[in-house]
Amino acid sequence: MSKRPGDIIISTPGSKVRRRLNFDSPYRNRATAPTVHVTNRKRAWVNRPMYRKPTMYRMYRSPDIPRGCEGPCKVQSFEQRDDVKHLGICKVISDVTRGPGLTHRVGKRFCIKSIYILGKIWLDETIKKQNHTNNVIFYLLRDRRPYGNAPQDFGQIFNMFDNEPSTATIKNDLRDRFQVLRKFHATVVGGPYGMKEQALVKRFYRLNHHVTYNHQEAGKYENHTENALLLYMACTHASNPVYATLKIRIYFYDSIGN
């Protein structure tokens, strides 16, 4: 006959075991449900139905489709290898061509709900042997009033101290036009000892960024009329460049007002 566990602590130099006292019948507690320990409070309500969740999770949940838009969710990918310099480079993320497919926009207006930046930054074979540290700084910008055939250069938008990209801020006369939505960085190290020749970049941001085009069908910067989405990249080392192999995906919805 098995003994009933007692509420005692058996402590040895190697282990400490706590046993719980149980006054119920041994036949009643033979089949017990497994206990799931949840460390994060938010995850405790993920698999519950909506009517079983607290009021906070029902009132303040973000909608799947942005307001004023309609499905399905469309995807546009930008895949390119860039040479990131100290002076900075720019990529237009909101270039979407007009068409009937799942990678096209239906009309003039659409909303970029989220963006996924995936890839790596890496050093060349000759550069990685030099003893140095290089940081690549990414700026995700909103251009509220696009103008011209191409976006402005890094130095025309940002005000820097001693031409250092890590101190870059939007110029005072351009603050109403350009807005920094997200900023992040990645680091690579060259040299014979603590070499880190490549660094992974993996970022996912929710933006709800509304873009407006003109009557043209081509997805170009010159056809934007409102809210172009730009990605600026610059490295902190003055002489050694960094290569960036990135895949940028935007998830967008067409506007109802088209």
UniProtKB/Swiss-Prot annotation:
Residue ranges annotated as motif Bipartite nuclear localization signal: 3-20, 202-249
Positions of unnamed zinc fingers: 69-86
Pfam families per UniProt: Gemini_coat (PF00844)
Entry GO MF terms: DNA binding; structural molecule activity; zinc ion binding
Superkingdom of origin organism: Viruses
GO biological process: symbiont entry into host cell; viral penetration into host nucleus
Keyword tags: Capsid protein, DNA-binding, Host nucleus, Host-virus interaction, Metal-binding, T=1 icosahedral capsid protein, Viral penetration into host nucleus, Virion, Virus entry into host cell, Zinc, Zinc-finger
This protein's record includes keyword DNA-binding: yes
Residue ranges of the TM segments: none
GO cellular component: host cell; host cell nucleus; T=1 icosahedral viral capsid
Motif (Nuclear localization signal): 41-55
The keyword Endoplasmic reticulum appears for this protein: no
Localisation per UniProt entry: Virion; Host nucleus
Entry-linked InterPro entries: Gem_coat_AR1, GV_A/BR1_coat, Viral_coat
Motif (Nuclear export signal): 102-123
Function of the protein: Encapsidates the viral DNA into characteristic twinned ('geminate') particles. Binds the genomic viral ssDNA and shuttles it into and out of the cell nucleus. The CP of bipartite geminiviruses is not required for cell-to-cell or systemic movement.
Known partners and oligomeric status: Homomultimer. Binds to single-stranded and double-stranded viral DNA. Interacts (via nuclear localization signals) with host importin alpha-1a.
Protein family (similarity comment): Belongs to the geminiviridae capsid protein family.
Name by which UniProt lists this protein: Capsid protein
Organism: African cassava mosaic virus (isolate West Kenyan 844)
Record lineage: Viruses, Monodnaviria, Shotokuvirae, Cressdnaviricota, Repensiviricetes
